[in-house]
Amino acid sequence: YHMTMMPVIFNDCSVAKRLYQEPVLGPQPEPVPGYFGGSDVTPFDDDTQNGDTVGYIPTDDPEMEPVAEAYVRELARTYGQDPRILIWNVWNEAGNSQRGDKSMPMLKKAFAWFREEDVMQPLTADVWGAGAEHPYGWLKMPGIYAEIEKEAIAQSEIVSFHFYGDYEHSRQYIRILEQYGRPLINTEWMHRPYRSIIQTHLPLWKKHKVGSYFFGFVNGKAQFNFVWEFIKKLPDIDTSLWMHDIFHSDFTPYDAEEIEVLKECNEDKKIF
């Protein structure tokens, strides 16, 4: 099928240390109804996104650095010349979950480890609005605010970004990011309640030669159709709309028009 992938290596979207649980193999807990991600233990609650709760990740513990290094180097040596890997996303949303610059030292080291292994694929760490006064407000004032985002761009051979804003603010953000003179990929978008929709945005990305990974595919146990907890009470959010996912669990489209736009944009032709 000529499919490629972008592995995500580290992630700052995290819960408080007292809530952290090590992942396990085998059967997973059944989803809690109504929650994005299928769990009511989430980094997307109001305390973590807008309050004082600071997320924890294992690399916060100094003794985990050798483990992290071995992990990166093994991945790089095994897949660093594999054409199925399109790009390495070294760090997801650095600074999320009130973490500020806590991940800065490890982010720099992780990039260095990949480069020392001489992987053939480009490296990136996405920018997403770290340092903005409020995640929702940032969608109307996109920009680069936090030091950790400036470092992410400095380290990245391809500028990847997450943006769920409407059409006009998406155009504005493209203009900001084009100034860096590197290829652009939006690796998280498509949020119907925020008016980031396939019908308007996918043609925009194609017009500006912006790569695209949108969030969600077939609705299932991850329950990506539900909005994040911290936006449920915002006055202009229609929570009856699916946030992510484009197919029901029986593979029928959520919105047939979206599928037609996807097909058209994936054709090798200009649409403007």
Name each model-derived stretch:
Residues I259-F272:
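Catalytic domains of carbohydrate-active enzymes that cleave complex glycans
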Residues Y164, F217, E267:
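Residue-level marker of positions within ordered structural domains that often coincide
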Residues Y1-S156, H162, Y167-H169, Q179-Y180, ...:
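Active-site mouth of glycoside hydrolases
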